Curated annotation (Swiss-Prot):
Source organism phylogeny: Bacteria, Pseudomonadati, Pseudomonadota, Gammaproteobacteria, Legionellales
NCBIfam families reported in the protein's UniProt record: L9
Biological role: Binds to the 23S rRNA.
Alphabetic keyword roster: Ribonucleoprotein, Ribosomal protein, RNA-binding, rRNA-binding
Name of the protein described by the UniProt record: Large ribosomal subunit protein bL9
Highest taxon listed in the record's lineage: Bacteria
Length: 149
């Protein structure tokens, strides 16, 4: 199925690109999330008329994401967790704990923006966690895990 992207989609294309996607991906994700429309003649003409408006909206979203990333890059969060004498945690520190610590600092973030490719953290120490605030903007958040005794 052919669709026209209304915003940049990671690993697919940019605003205004006409791309071929599987029917399920288009109908169940891209179109309901307003990330794309069917590539009909009528939609192509409508998109050409709205292109400047959509590009301006995308630029505003990018500028907003860069501001959030700058704030996150300057932030260090400290998470206290129960740990053994060797520094191993009794459990782990994952996305939920990081999100809760950021909310305590009045920084709004969603769980899906936090990326931990190696999985949850299992020991005391300092870590850098990636936060994908936009498809083009990645912030590095400093996380310090200390022992709660």
């Amino acid at each position: 199925m052919e669709v026209i992207l209304l915003e940049k989609v990671r690993n697919l294309g940019n605003l205004g690109d006409k791309v071929h996607v599987k029917s399920g991906y288009g109908r169940n994700y891209l179109i309901p999330q307003n990330k794309a429309v069917f590539a009909t003649e009528q939609n192509i003409e409508l998109f050409q008329k709205r292109r400047a408006e959509l590009e301006k909206k995308a630029q505003q979203a990018l500028a907003n994401a860069e501001q959030r990333a700058a704030k996150l890059n300057d932030t260090t969060i400290v998470i206290s967790a129960m740990a053994s004498d060797e520094g191993k945690l009794y459990g782990s520190v994952g996305v939920n704990e990081i999100k809760d610590a950021l909310i305590e600092k009045q920084i709004e973030i969603s769980k899906r923006e936090i990326v931990m490719p190696e999985g949850p953290l299992h020991s005391i120490g300092n870590y850098v966690v990636e936060v994908h605030v936009h498809s083009d903007v990645v912030a590095n958040l400093q996380v310090e895990i200390i022992s709660a005794k």
